[in-house]
């Protein structure tokens, strides 16, 4: 995601998370070749830092909980994918990066979490958990995957609605709308967690990428999943 800000003097942070994107799809790691087109990531790489000795939990919820709290999964209790009400979920009493920045940093931050959550099940009693854990704004979906990128449920500060804008586009739109409300008196922290490229694989809007040669049929997707990655 690229945008122009008038906030360069502030220590603003945007943490972008891609879902189910392994380094085996990225040619800028040793002995690996691009199997997916990632032009924006490659552009970021030219002015950024590439870490080559980094480890994370191999599945979604423990990895997110680790980034969120800075603690191992045996500490947070989130040791596997959260798939049902019986799955261990993140204790809202955990100290999070959002709480630290919003409530305890020398200069307090505005905070937002936009996109996939997957630290709790999506039940009404938990819709405000992201806010309770340090975010001024939460807008996204709690589940491990959305069944349809063109229609899904969204929780926004404890209220559910149905979204019919393509999920990746809606996530960016929500982020830009929130950043437009920021000012130069207070820095911001944005956790931006895309559902993509997690399955279900599908034909994305032609306005976002080159879809030539892709039919979008279930047969083609099953036979050539990497083309839809």
Q: Which positions does each model-derived feature cover?
A:
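Bacterial Sec-dependent N-terminal signal peptides
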Residues: 1-11
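Formylglycine-dependent sulfatase
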Residues: 10-229
């Amino acid at each position: 995601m690229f945008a122009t800000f008038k906030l360069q003097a502030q220590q603003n942070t945007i943490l972008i998370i891609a879902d189910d994107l392994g380094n085996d799809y990225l040619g800028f790691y040793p002995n690996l070749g691009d199997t997916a087109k990632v032009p924006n990531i490659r552009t970021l790489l030219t002015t950024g830092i590439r870490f080559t000795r980094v480890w994370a939990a191999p599945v979604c919820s423990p990895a997110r909980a680790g980034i969120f709290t800075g603690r191992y999964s045996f500490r947070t209790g989130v040791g596997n994918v959260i798939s049902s009400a019986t799955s261990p979920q993140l204790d809202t009493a955990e100290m999070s990066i959002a709480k630290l920045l919003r409530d305890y940093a020398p200069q307090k931050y505005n905070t937002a979490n936009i996109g996939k959550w997957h630290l709790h099940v999506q039940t009404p009693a938990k819709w405000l958990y992201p806010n309770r854990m340090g975010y001024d704004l939460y807008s996204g979906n709690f589940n491990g995957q959305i069944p349809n990128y063109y229609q899904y449920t969204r929780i926004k500060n404890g209220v559910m609605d149905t979204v019919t804008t393509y999920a990746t586009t809606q996530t960016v739109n929500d982020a830009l709308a929130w950043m437009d409300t920021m000012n130069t008196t207070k820095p911001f922290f944005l956790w931006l967690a895309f559902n993509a490229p997690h399955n279900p694989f599908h034909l994305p809007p032609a306005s976002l990428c080159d879809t030539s040669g892709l039919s979008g049929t279930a047969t083609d997707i099953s036979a050539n999943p990497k083309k839809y990655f």
